[in-house]
Amino acid sequence: MDPGALLQAVRHGIDGGDLLMWASDADEQAVIEGLGASGEVSLDPAAPQLGVYLNNGSWSKFEWYLNIDFSMGEAAANADGSRTYPCSLRLTNAMTPEELEASNAVITGGNPAKRSEDDMLEVLNLYAPAGGRIEVTDHNGQVDLADDKTYRGLQVVCGEAHVQIGAPAEISFNVTVSPEASQELSVRIPPTVQDYR
C-alpha cells in the first residue's frame, strides 16, 4: 500500500466530512480536533456554518434509500451587517414499491412512531451558525417541528421528517449569520449513498 495515497484518502475523507473520529484519550482527541476530524460544530461567528443533521428514527437500514437535496440562495444584506440566506431541504425516499414489497422490518424498521411501512423516519436537527439564527418559513405535512433547543450556545431547530415513497419531506428556512461573519455560510450535511446506489 502506498502511504501517500492512504494519507491523501484520509485527508479527502476528513475534508468532505465523510471521515470523523473520536478518542477517549484527551491528547489523542486534541490531535483529532486539530485535524478537523472530530465532527464538532463550528463556534466561530467569523466562519459561519449551518449544520443539517439527520438521525435514523426508523430503527432500520432504510437510509440506504435516502436522497438529500439541499439548496441555498443568494444572501441578502441586513441593516445590522448580518446576512440572511434562504435555504431549502428536501428528503426523498428512493425505494420503489417493488423493493418495499420484497423488504422486511430489518430494512424498513419497527419504530411505532412511523406513519406507514414505507416511512423513513428521520430525526431532523438544524444547527444555526455561531452568532446567527434560523427561521423556518415553510414546511410540508411530512415535517413535524418541536421546540427549538440550544447546543453550546447555538440555536437548534428540532423535528421529525416522515419520508415516504412518493411523499418527500420539505422544509424551507432562512439562516442569518452574525455581523462578525467574514466568510460565506458553509453547510455541513451528512453523506449518503445517493450518488453510489
Residue ranges, per PLM feature:
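Lumenal/extracellular ectodomains and adaptor appendage modules
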Residues: 1-197
